[in-house]
From Swiss-Prot:
It comes from the Archaea. PROSITE patterns: RIBOSOMAL_S19 (PS00323). GO terms for biological process: ribosomal small subunit assembly; translation. Protein S19 forms a complex with S13 that binds strongly to the 16S ribosomal RNA. The gene is rps19. It comes from Saccharolobus solfataricus (strain ATCC 35092 / DSM 1617 / JCM 11322 / P2). The keyword Ribosomal protein applies. Keywords: Ribonucleoprotein, Ribosomal protein, RNA-binding, rRNA-binding. This is Small ribosomal subunit protein uS19.
Length: 140
């Protein structure tokens, strides 16, 4: 699981640990660094879908496929250090939203980076849509 760390990530620390320390750290030690919600989620274990995604990630790392995007519907996986540097595409209910996992994302969920709703932008009301439109000039 070798990862070439870009220069801008060299100084990054998560709870006082560098990226190299996080990558070499056993899972139970890493879990202790997480906030309570993520810690409890990981202590319960991985679901089948999460396990399958992590196996796929490990396979891509072994083969050195860092530029290939991994598509997934799994939104409830906590971002682990082994996901750093990979391109992920998480389904938001309509399409896959693509992003690259950075060290700042550790401890967050994948779904946080694939927003499921968008801001509603209402258009202009049509002719006779409201009582006030009675006084508008007829569209020609």
């Amino acid at each position: 699981m070798s990862l070439e760390i870009p220069p801008e990530w060299k100084n990054f620390k998560y709870r006082g640990k560098s990226i190299d320390e996080l990558l070499n750290m056993p899972m139970d030690e890493f879990i202790k660094l997480l906030p309570s919600r993520q810690r409890r989620s990981l202590k319960r274990g991985f679901t089948d879908a999460q396990r399958h995604l992590l196996e796929k990630v490990r396979k891509y790392r072994r083969e050195g496929k860092f530029n290939k995007t991994i598509k997934t519907h799994v939104r409830n996986l906590v971002i682990l250090p082994e996901l750093i540097g990979l391109k992920m595409a998480v389904y938001n209910g309509k399409e896959f939203v693509e992003f690259t996992v950075t060290p700042e994302m550790i401890g967050h969920y994948l779904g946080e980076y694939s927003i499921t709703t968008k801001k509603v932008e209402h258009g202009e009301p049509g002719l006779k849509a409201t009582r006030s439109s009675l006084f508008l000039a007829m569209k020609g």
